Swiss-Prot record:
The lineage of its organism: Viruses, Varidnaviria, Bamfordvirae, Nucleocytoviricota, Pokkesviricetes. This is Envelope phospholipase OPG057. Interacts with protein OPG190. Residues 307-334 form the PLD phosphodiesterase domain. Major envelope protein that plays a role in the biogenesis of the viral double membrane and in egress of virus from the host cell. Produces the wrapped form of virus that is required for cell-to-cell spread. Acts as a lipase with broad specificity including phospholipase C, phospholipase A, and triacylglycerol lipase activities. Keywords: Host endoplasmic reticulum, Host Golgi apparatus, Host membrane, Host-virus interaction, Hydrolase, Late protein, Lipoprotein, Membrane, Palmitate, Viral budding, Viral budding via the host ESCRT complexes, Viral envelope protein, Viral release from host cell, Virion.
């Protein structure tokens, strides 16, 4: 019935946030806890979750969500949680707590063993989905600032479920040749919507390149294209910008996103605001990169601030016309090696709502000048 139905603006997407209780502002949007709770409550057939790691029991709200999942699984709802092979530290405890949930560890890069599953998304019944930067941890549900998108528009949920199928094909328990065969089966039907064919002004982008499949857009290509075509403004709220790729303990320069930001500021006079995170998970190059941008563009309209509370929000807004929400840092290692799905939209309402979030964060008491 989808081809004959009118497509709602923004594909029925709503922004979703986690805000720590010690912040000086609240959100009018759906909380991550409310979003995950609704997905579980409305599920009738299945719930699929992809996350680097799984540690919901670390906070009270995370534990409540996991208990709801346990209840759903006991009622016969099929629940699969994909974890990266290197993010399975708490797996034994969770399996003993709820044996009816199927936990699958994946390795998306058995050949080189450098790629990780970074994607943070939920899909249920091909009807509802969440994608953003909230992993399936108690912190992301309760104590760490995150941003994502929830939709109950079935075509969009189905399109995201195809990504789940792709990542699931890299089950680390399978032989490598089985991984390749399984992936080959799901890649040809890997997406229905992309930058040239958005649905309601919405589409997903993907990484890394070897998992793209037919007609998917490489996330780095879309991000860099948007940065290079920016005319008036670029607003970035990210945990880190790191112009390097790490392989086997060695660092290699990867300036693609970094250069695109500098070119926009210096060559085209674009107004740029960069709000970076500052906590112990940051790459050593992150603050150095922020300072170098601030210094190099001192004669241009580029401002840098640091968010002082744990902030895993990863948001890009260009010309107040395009919004990008992802689970990856603007980091060469993430973009060259890791597996994730990003949300993109040119829908005016969604862009406007995301812009309000950025403005709120930018002027809050938690945002400090880099020069202080």
């Amino acid at each position: 019935m989808w081809p004959f139905a009118s497509v709602p603006a923004g594909a029925k997407c709503r922004l979703v946030e986690t805000l720590p209780e010690n912040m000086d502002f609240r959100s009018d949007h759906l909380t991550t806890f409310e979003c995950f709770n609704e997905i579980i409550t409305l599920a009738k057939k299945y719930i699929y979750i992809a996350s680097f790691c799984c540690n919901p029991l670390s906070t009270t709200r995370g534990a409540l969500i996991f208990d709801k999942l346990k209840e759903a699984s006991e009622k016969g709802i099929k629940i699969i949680v994909l974890l990266d092979e290197r993010g399975k530290r708490n797996l034994g405890e969770l399996q003993s707590h709820c044996p009816d949930i199927n936990f699958i560890t994946v390795n998306i890069d058995k050949k080189n063993n450098v790629g990780l599953l970074l994607g943070c998304f939920w899909v249920s019944d091909d009807e509802r989905c969440y994608v953003g930067n909230a992993s399936f941890t108690g912190g992301s549900i309760h104590t760490i600032k995150t941003l994502g998108v929830y939709s109950d528009y079935p075509p969009l949920a189905t399109d995201l479920r195809r990504r789940f199928d792709t990542f699931k094909a890299f089950d680390s328990a399978k032989n490598s040749w089985l991984n390749l065969c399984s992936a080959a089966c799901c890649l040809p039907v890997s997406t229905a919507y992309h930058i040239k064919n958005p649905i309601g002004g919405v589409f997903f982008t993907d990484s890394p390149e070897h998992l793209l499949g037919y007609s998917r857009d490489l996330d780095t290509d879309v991000v860099i294209d948007k940065l290079k075509s920016a005319k008036t403004s670029i607003d970035i709220e990210h945990l880190a910008i790191v112009p390097t790729t790490r392989v086997d303990g060695n660092s290699y320069y990867w300036p693609d996103i970094y250069n695109s930001i500098i070119e926009a500021a210096i060559n085209r006079g674009v107004k740029i605001r960069l709000l970076v995170g500052n906590w112990d998970k940051n790459d050593v190059y992150s603050m150095a990169t922020a300072r170098s941008l601030d210094a190099l563009c001192v004669q241009n309209d580029l401002s840098v601030k640091v968010f002082t509370i744990q902030n895993n929000t990863k948001l890009l807004i260009v010309d107040d016309e395009y919004v990008h929400i992802t689970s990856a840092n603007f980091d060469g290692t993430h973009y060259q090696n890791h597996g994730f799905v990003s949300f993109n939209s040119i829908d005016k309402q969604l862009v406007s709502e995301a812009k309000k979030i950025f403005e709120r964060d930018w002027v809050s008491s938690h945002s400090k000048s880099l020069k202080i």
